[in-house]
Amino acid sequence: MAVKIRLRRMGAKKAPFYRIIVADSRAPRDGKFIDEIGYYNPLTEPVEVKINEEKANEWLSNGAQPTEVVKRLFNNAGLTK
């Protein structure tokens, strides 16, 4: 099972809010997930990002692959693989 760290869209129409989740790569974007490790709100100024670093590092060490957007969020937050 390939595990990805990716964004799950929440919020209203034209007002997106994202949760950073760990999910099977074959699961739909807003479908079943394994764990929630944070959130990302692109509409606030400055952009609001909260990541549980302990959980994120645990999943990265277990082999979960972050998507490109999540990699960028991790780098901005100071988390590196």
Curated annotation (Swiss-Prot):
Highest taxon, organism lineage: Bacteria
GO cellular component: cytoplasm; small ribosomal subunit
A Pfam family it matches: Ribosomal_S16
Keyword Nucleotide-binding: no
InterPro entries tied to this protein: Ribosomal_bS16 (IPR000307), Ribosomal_bS16_dom_sf (IPR023803)
GO molecular function: structural constituent of ribosome
Biological process (GO), any one: translation
Keyword match Ribonucleoprotein: yes
Alphabetically ordered keywords of this record: Ribonucleoprotein, Ribosomal protein
NCBIfam families registered for this protein in UniProt: S16 (TIGR00002)
Similarity annotation: Belongs to the bacterial ribosomal protein bS16 family.
Protein name as it appears in the record: Small ribosomal subunit protein bS16
Organism: Clostridium beijerinckii (strain ATCC 51743 / NCIMB 8052)
Protein encoded by which gene: rpsP
